[in-house]
Amino acid sequence: VKIAVLYASSRRGGNSERLAEVLVEGMDVDSLFLTDYRIEPIVDYRHTEPGSYPEDDYRKLLDRVLKQDLLIFATPIYWYGMPGRLKLFIDRWSQSLRENRKEFLDRMAGKRAYVLAVGDDDPHVKGRALIEQFRHIFDFVGIRFAGHVIGRGNRPGDIEQDAEALSAAREIRKRILAEMDAGSHR
C-alpha cells in the first residue's frame, strides 16, 4: 500500500502534523508538506476558450498524489474549513478534469482517504462542515472516504492532551497495518 500524507498547515510541528505522525508511525509514507509547493489559484476555462494554466508546482504535487493508494489529509480547521493551500490544490483538480477528465477520474478512483482535522473552538461541532466537504470531494472523484479523526488543539503540542483523538489515530494505524500485513500474505 502506497501512502501519502498531505500536510495542510502553514506551520511545521503543529497539531495536525503530530496527529498524522501518530497515525503513520513506523509506516513508509510520502510526506507532502503543502508549504513546500507553490500552487496558484485555478483559472476557470469552463465556459471560454482554454488559455494557459499557471506555471507552478501543481503537476509535481499531483503526480505524487496519483501514485498513492491511500491519502491522509492532515489539516487544521481554519474558519470552519480547510486552509487555503489545500483548497487551492483541490480547486486545481478542475484543471485536471478539463484536460483529461477520464484519466484523472480513473487514477483517483479506488484510492482511500482519511482526514485528520484539528481545531480549538469546539472542533467536533465546528469541524463537521470540513468533514462533509471532504466527503463530497471524495465522492465526486471516486475516492473512498475511509474515516476521520477530529482533535482539539491550538498551541503546538496541545493535541497531546486529546487522548480520544490520539487513540482514534492509533486505531486507524492498526487497521492500516493489518490490511498491509494481510496483503503481504496473499
Residue ranges: model-predicted function:
Residues 147-152:
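Beta-strand-loop-alpha "switch" segments that mediate conformational coupling across diverse proteins
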Residues 5, 54, 116-120, 155:
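A short, mixed-charge helix-start or loop-turn motif at secondary-structure junctions
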Residues 103-146:
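Short, glycine-/small-residue-rich phosphate/pyrophosphate-handling segment
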Residues 10-13, 77-80, 120-124, 154-157:
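Short histidine/acidic/glycine/proline-rich micro-motifs that form metal-
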Residues 1-103, 163-186:
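N-terminal beta1-alpha1-beta2 submodule of the flavodoxin-like/Rossmannoid cofactor-binding fold
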Residues 40-43, 153-159:
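A short acidic, helix-capping loop that chelates divalent metal ions and anchors anionic groups
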Residues 125-127, 158-163:
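Short, solvent-exposed loop/turn segments at secondary-structure boundaries
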